[in-house]
């Protein structure tokens, strides 16, 4: 399987608070990327945030060796021809270490960039966009006239390192999103709903993909926060500390922002906690070790796996049993929790940890023997 970390701010122990947020710098991102690379993760997601994900990712190529960059791209903000050229250039310079996360966004975010399309119009746009982009990445010369996109003799002179093309990833919870994923996407991502809810998506998209002649062509991933400690009690104590720092102002602000978003995925995340902060944080444990409290102060994915290493591994197995072989995880703060997850959980997952090639055999033997005690 593949396990990716996260490389986008804000960051800190309580990043929704001024006194809990970490100052981000290029040097810090270098440090974080090197850590992710060395610790044996597959790579990391560079999502939409304060920094431009493409410039950030390109600047980190020289500081990593195995790190796969999963970089977000919003179709309405770049022509498909320009994005294809960016992808080919990045793939060549990184020697094949790129995946592209196609992000449909929401009306509120897109309006900030001057794009005013309804929910279904955005997916219709993305459908046309990916038709053109995929052909360009295959090396074709493209002439296409659609409702939203019209290109004439479009082509990219640079071949990609990865064949037949750089992998395209995608997330979305509406019927329109499912259709786009089924037609075009290599890896479909879900935010951290319960394994049962996530499996329902897997089945729906597999059925649609088969209708498009793409049976078996799509892999599936899940995006989660993680709060893992050596014992369950320690993990829930850490979650309690995070919960105690969720002040009313932060919750009201976050919930006011997501209330106006037309993203179905965001609406499904918000429904898990209902915008309320009960006295007992365990009331937001929506499934074993799956806690929805993060969504009170963060938009986007808002659930965390909370527990001991053994419990977190069991819950990851639940998602694998539901058809997910890609895991994107993060913790707060990003750097410290990347090390913690790599120590407690990552060695027990079937990940190709190529970055460990230079580690001495005595170290790995001692480490593996130690981990057998908690497996």
Q: What role is predicted for each listed range?
A:
Residues 7-27, 47, 72-81, 120, ...:
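Active-site mouth loops of central-metabolism enzymes
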Residues 1-10, 115, 119-161, 195-320, ...:
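An alpha-helical appendage that flanks or caps ligand/catalytic pockets
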Residues 36, 40, 60, 90, ...:
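Conserved, mostly hydrophobic/aromatic
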Residues 1-66, 145, 161-166:
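N-terminal beta1-alpha1-beta2 module of alpha/beta enzyme domains
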Residues 76-92:
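Glycine-rich anion/phosphate-binding loops
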Residues 34-38, 57-66, 87, 91-98, ...:
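Acidic (Asp/Glu)-rich catalytic clusters
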Residues 41-63, 192-196, 328-342:
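Glycine-rich, proline-tolerant flexible connector loops at the mouths of alpha/beta enzymes
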Residues 3-7, 43-46, 67-73, 98-102, ...:
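Hydrophobic faces of well-ordered beta-strands that scaffold small-molecule active sites
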